[in-house]
């Protein structure tokens, strides 16, 4: 009984993968499928023109993103609350 349930589940998974593959025309199908299954996005290394929260910075150079400010004490970007 356990083997029958396992085979039925494996068949459904295989049917899902084959159906998804037939609709996909991209060459990066395995990566796309794994990222959808595990909800993991591939890091593409997009560069920003500013530094985000926790990034090291130099006070006075205005390197941090909008709504962030460089901390004089810790030398990293923090959220600017406006005093």
Curated annotation (Swiss-Prot):
Cellular component per GO, a single term: host cell presynaptic membrane
Any one GO MF term held by the record is: sodium channel regulator activity
Disulphide bridges: 50-65, 57-70, 64-77
Please tell me whether the keyword rRNA-binding is annotated for this protein.
Answer: no
InterPro entries (UniProt xref): Huwentoxin-1, Huwentoxin_CS1
Q: Where in the cell is it found?
A: Secreted
Pro-piece positions: 22-48
Question: Where on the chain is Leucine amide found, per UniProt?
Answer: 81
* Superkingdom assignment: Eukaryota
* UniProt entry keywords in alphabetical sequence: Amidation, Disulfide bond, Ion channel impairing toxin, Knottin, Neurotoxin, Presynaptic neurotoxin, Secreted, Signal, Toxin, Voltage-gated sodium channel impairing toxin
Quick one: signal sequence residues?
Answer: 1-21
| Family annotation (Pfam families) | Toxin_12
What tissues has this protein been observed in?
Expressed by the venom gland.
To which protein family does this belong? Belongs to the neurotoxin 10 (Hwtx-1) family. 15 (Hntx-3) subfamily.
The entry's function note states: Lethal neurotoxin. Selectively blocks tetrodotoxin-sensitive voltage-gated sodium channels (Nav). Does not affect tetrodotoxin-resistant voltage-gated sodium channels or calcium channels.
Subunit (UniProt): Monomer.
Its domain description in UniProt is: The presence of a 'disulfide through disulfide knot' structurally defines this protein as a knottin.
Q: Kindly provide the name given to this protein in its UniProt entry.
A: Mu-theraphotoxin-Hhn2j 3
What species was this sequence derived from? Cyriopagopus hainanus (Chinese bird spider)
């Amino acid at each position: 009984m356990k083997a029958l349930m396992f085979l039925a589940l494996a068949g459904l998974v295989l049917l899902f993968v084959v159906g998804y593959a037939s609709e996909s025309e991209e060459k990066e199908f395995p990566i796309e499928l794994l990222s959808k299954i595990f909800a993991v996005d591939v890091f593409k290394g997009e560069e920003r023109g500013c530094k985000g929260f926790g990034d090291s910075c130099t006070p006075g150079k205005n390197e941090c993103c909008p709504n962030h400010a460089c901390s004089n004490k810790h030398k990293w970007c923090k959220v600017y609350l406006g005093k």
